[in-house]
Amino acid sequence: MAKILVLYYSMYGHIETLAGAIAEGARKVSGVDVTIKRVPETMPAEAFAKAGGKTNQQAPVATPHELADYDGIIFGTPTRFGNMSGQMRTFLDQTGGLWASGALYGKVASVFASTGTGGGQEHTITSTWTTLAHHGFIIVPIGYGAKELFDVSQTRGGTPYGATTIAGGDGSRQPSAEELAIARFQGEHVAKITAKLKG
């Protein structure tokens, strides 16, 4: 059975919501076991609470060494100035031992993201790919396989690189039905490829 990890960081819950949709899509594929985990928070608790961070996230916290236990990993991160969040960066910076041993080489990876106003969402995904390439992950974008990517009638996230959501400058906009559909597509797409490669 192929094992897939949906690994995310979410401060306000947008990426957490997308992670749930990604996992839902992946679970449509038979022969796949899906786990959702999050990376540790690095902000001091007081600063996190003052910033309005979501403290009741149910996903357990992952440790870097356990990444080797999975056949495919779908990473989710909010955009911070066109890059992944510091929390995800800190987590991935602890995977040097996995890199040295080649523990992640040949595993499947994909990325999803959120932005406040849309700026940097594609760059966040593609810049995250750089770290994944150094590990030797097989990087899986979604292309234009999700029909929702052709809908230009409304503001929405979603790119050929991976699912995204636009949270709005104040974070009040939640993922739309179209954005969640794209996320489910990504989960299912990555799960199918992972299962095929696992054999």
Swiss-Prot record:
It catalyses: a quinone + NADH + H(+) = a quinol + NAD(+); a quinone + NADPH + H(+) = a quinol + NADP(+). FMN binds at residues 10-15, 79-81, 114-119, 134. GO terms for molecular function: flavin adenine dinucleotide binding; FMN binding; NAD binding; NADH:ubiquinone reductase (non-electrogenic) activity; NADP binding; NADPH dehydrogenase (quinone) activity. Residues 4-190 form the Flavodoxin-like domain. Keywords: Flavoprotein, FMN, NAD, NADP, Nucleotide-binding, Oxidoreductase. Substrate binds at W99. HAMAP family: NQOR. PANTHER family: FLAVODOXIN-RELATED PROTEIN WRBA-RELATED, FLAVOPROTEIN-LIKE PROTEIN YCP4-RELATED. This is NAD(P)H dehydrogenase (quinone). The lineage of its organism: Bacteria, Pseudomonadati, Pseudomonadota, Gammaproteobacteria, Enterobacterales.
